[in-house]
Amino acid sequence: MLKFIQNNREATALLAIVCLFVFPGALDSQYLSVQTLTMVFSSAQILMLLAIGATMVMLTRNIDVSVGSTTGMCAVLLGVMLNAGYSLPVACLATLILGIVAGFFNGVLVAWLKIPAIVATLGTLGLYRGIMLLWTGGKWIEGLPAGLKQLSAPVFLGISAIGWFTLVLALLMAWLLAKTAFGRNFYATGDNLQGARQLGVRTEMVRIMAFSLNGGMAALAGIVFASQIGFIPNQTGTGLEMKAIAACVLGGISLLGGSGTVIGAILGAYFLTQIDSVLVLLRIPAWWNDFIAGLVLLGVLVFDGRLRCALQRNLRRQKYARFISPPTPLQTEAKTHAQQNKNKEVA
């Protein structure tokens, strides 16, 4: 049972999503609708994109806490260029390039300069946030063109063009990780760095690629953010890095690297966003959101840790069982006889 849960974390996340629909649905039948599904998905698109990027980094046994600032910085560049008269495709392309460059810089710090990922990305978190504020002077960016907002308008089955793009991108990344040598390199790097090097995997380039892809996903998240709300606050992206990591952990991505899937991370992002919608239904104040999300994350971490310990004990038991010979019938009979004599003496 424990092994099944560990090997099917996506199913566990999906079950949690279903339960989180059923229980509120018992209180309000209108909650159980396709409209609710699409509404939560629309709200989860930003976090899903960030979770895809975080998956790539976490698979290599690293972590990036600068994606929130990268998202904000890229959103600001998009807004500045659009208000300066650049076309939407050009502005989006420049935004994507900026995100990839920001991620590449993180990767260089970690892979080539050997700075611990948490330290390097904490530094760039402040750097990218500072660049964002310098560009805007601390002001909000408003007056974005209608063409940008149109990207988030429903086009089919209540899902926007950006929503369909997010789904296709998630499926593509899931396929790349599961079915190609490119994806297996990420797992190998995170699972056994030295072993991957001996097999010829260019682990430094894999990690740089992971951070670069993460930056690209953060840029896409910035575009989605701007298109959904129609303006860019000066605190755009704040706190998103923790939610992205939480979504990955909820979906079964190991903090120790080398295991997990993009689909699990997507389901984790959906579940976290769904919690917010349930809190609204229950009329719980918004300031409880972070507390409850953190509580859920801690619960999952504790469960994940206990599950891993139980699996390791089971593996050790199976590994050394062949060295422990079972007792012979004569030994069993002698032990039983000795126990009976001991019981008589006590009586």
Curated annotation (Swiss-Prot):
Chief location bin: membrane
Family statement drawn from the similarity comment of this UniProt entry: Belongs to the binding-protein-dependent transport system permease family. AraH/RbsC subfamily.
Role according to the record: Part of the ABC transporter complex LsrABCD involved in autoinducer 2 (AI-2) import. Probably responsible for the translocation of the substrate across the membrane.
Lineage of the organism: Bacteria, Pseudomonadati, Pseudomonadota, Gammaproteobacteria, Enterobacterales
Compartment(s) of residence: Cell inner membrane
Topological type in the membrane: Multi-pass membrane protein
Induction: In the absence of AI-2, repressed by LsrR. Induced by AI-2, via release of the LsrR repressor.
Self-association state and partner proteins as the record states: The complex is composed of two ATP-binding proteins (LsrA), two transmembrane proteins (LsrC and LsrD) and a solute-binding protein (LsrB).
GO CC annotations, alphabetized: plasma membrane
Record-given protein name: Autoinducer 2 import system permease protein LsrC
Record-level Gene Ontology MF annotations: transmembrane transporter activity
Bilayer-spanning residue ranges: 14-34, 39-59, 72-92, 93-113, 115-135, 155-175, 213-233, 249-269, 284-304
A Pfam family that the UniProt record links to this protein: BPD_transp_2
Organism: Salmonella typhimurium (strain LT2 / SGSC1412 / ATCC 700720)
Keywords, comma-separated and alphabetical: Cell inner membrane, Cell membrane, Membrane, Transmembrane, Transmembrane helix, Transport
InterPro entries: ABC_transp_permease
Signal peptide: none
